[in-house]
């Protein structure tokens, strides 16, 4: 059976209780996830997503305030492509 790789998510969501058997081997028992740690992880991820969204919208706003020839060309091309897609679907 393939063993799961130890990722930050599995480290966060799994409590590993190591128990010794009589023959000296260690077994791992997966416990319930710690809800506080899960929520903390979720909030951190969502915060990073929000920061990314703010950065993207800020860059877009700056490009509209002070457009370069390249950014105008890119916007026009995107609008033309989306317009063509709508024509084909209508």
From Swiss-Prot:
GO terms for cellular component: host cell cytosol; host cell mitochondrial inner membrane; host cell nucleus; membrane. Disulfide bonds: none annotated. The record marks 66 as: Low pathogenicity. Residues 1-29 have a biased composition (Polar residues). Keywords: Apoptosis, Host cytoplasm, Host membrane, Host mitochondrion, Host mitochondrion inner membrane, Host nucleus, Host-virus interaction, Inhibition of host innate immune response by virus, Inhibition of host MAVS by virus, Inhibition of host RLR pathway by virus, Membrane, Modulation of host cell apoptosis by virus, Viral immunoevasion. The keyword Lipid metabolism does not apply. Residues 1-31 are annotated as: Disordered. Transmembrane segments: none annotated. One of its GO terms (biological process) is symbiont-mediated perturbation of host apoptosis. It comes from the Viruses. InterPro entries: Flu_proapoptotic_PB1-F2. Pfam families: PB1-F2. Its main location: host cell. Belongs to the influenza viruses PB1-F2 family. Is not encoded in all strains, and seems to be dispensable for replication. Plays an important role in promoting lung pathology in both primary viral infection and secondary bacterial infection. Promotes alteration of mitochondrial morphology, dissipation of mitochondrial membrane potential, and cell death. Alternatively, inhibits the production of interferon in the infected cell at the level of host mitochondrial antiviral signaling MAVS. Its level of expression differs greatly depending on which cell type is infected, in a manner that is independent of the levels of expression of other viral proteins. Monocytic cells are more affected than epithelial cells. Oligomer. Interacts with human SLC25A6/ANT3 and VDAC1. Interacts with host MAVS. This is Protein PB1-F2. It comes from Influenza A virus (strain A/Memphis/18/1978 H3N2).
